[in-house]
A protein has these predicted regions:
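All-alpha prenyltransferase/terpene-synthase fold signal
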Residues: 1-333
Length: 333
């Protein structure tokens, strides 16, 4: 799947979202504007607005409506992207990250204070897009959904920190963390997209189900790449375990080799004082099928995401959503 081809297919809708992002991030303050422009030029695949626009258009076509998308759909799509990047700017400070998507982070270039402030700016501009310019733009349900997502993002970070200290993450904890930190933002992107075109309850539910499963698959793939990726991923291998994060590949390896699970968890606890334990844990994961275990779970979520698309009528957008799910499993970045 070529993301550039999907953007081209989305045409004026994609351009409208990009224009909104550019205008929303303009401040008239040189340092802030230069930083924002640099971030936008390295903003990755922008999967959340891509997902949002595809869902909006799929809902319209499934309902047999020939109308085009309006600024409401564009605003929600752009807001999701701003919110996503705001969390990354804050995450880079919390994690002490020097690289993001293969380029230096704002934290590394300009310091943690600037990264936090820029993240705050992106967050506020996301809220502005959600609210709209006029009273008629205000949708209390959408505001509540984005608010719940913000809460989930914070809760996920805190739960991950708590579990990193205790090294007792289990599969249920892991799913909750990746729902809060990743899947919830996919979910709100898709659900507000459906709401923006007045989709039926059936299509809303299908959009939500697809997006949550896609989000799970996306994060599991990220966690797999942390153990088996290459330099093209944009970050060194083993970052998660060095930060004491027990993700699905490690959970899988411990499930496959339970007699060593207790010792491995103790090693995770001691990584701050024994950095060499990280390399030993990475080897343990590779030797005990942890990556393969996670890949099997990933494929289940991909299949479930594709299954959720059955509620939509046949259209190019539906096919692209299917391709997006398959692409998530195969990507190498």
């Amino acid at each position: 799947m070529e993301i550039s081809g999907v953007r081209e297919y989305l045409g004026d809708d994609w351009k409208a979202v990009q224009d909104l992002l550019g205008s929303a991030l303009h401040s008239g303050i040189e340092l802030l504007d230069t930083t924002n422009e640099n971030l936008l030029s390295h903003s990755g695949k922008q999967l959340r607005p891509l997902l949002s626009l595809l869902i909006s258009r799929a809902c319209l076509k499934s309902a047999g409506v020939s109308e085009k998308l309006t600024q409401v759909s564009w605003r929600y799509a752009a807001a999701a992207e701003l919110l996503h990047n705001a969390t990354l700017l804050h995450d880079d400070v919390a994690d002490g990250s020097d690289l993001r998507r293969g380029v230096p982070t704002v934290r590394a270039m300009l310091g943690p204070q600037v990264s936090v402030l820029v993240g705050d700016f992106w967050l506020v501009r996301a809220v502005s897009l959600i609210l709209g310019d006029n009273d008629s733009d205000y949708n209390p349900r959408v505001v509540k959904l984005f608010s719940q997502t913000l809460s989930s993002l914070a809760e996920g970070e805190m739960l991950q920190l708590q579990k990193a200290m205790s090294a007792d993450t289990d599969y249920g904890d892991y799913l909750r963390i990746i729902y809060c930190k990743t899947a919830s933002l996919f979910e709100v992107s898709a659900l507000t997209a459906a709401i923006s075109v007045f989709a039926s309850k059936q299509l809303e539910d299908a959009a939500r189900d697809y997006a949550v499963k896609l989000g799970y698959a996306f994060q599991i793939k990220d966690d797999i790449l942390d153990y088996s990726g290459t330099a093209s991923v944009g970050k060194p291998l083993g970052v998660d375990v060095r930060e004491q994060k027990i993700t699905l590949p490690l959970l899988g390896a411990m499930a496959n080799c339970p007699q060593k699970a207790g010792r491995v968890r103790e090693m995770v606890k001691k990584i701050p004082d024994h950095g060499e334990f990280a390399d030993e844990i990475i080897s343990f994961v590779k030797e005990n099928g942890g990556v393969e275990y996670a890949a099997e779970k990933l494929n289940v979520f991909v299949d479930e995401a594709i299954g959720a698309l059955d509620a939509f009528g046949d259209c190019r957008e539906k096919e692209l959503l299917k391709e997006l799910a398959l692409f998530t499993a195969k990507r190498t970045w």
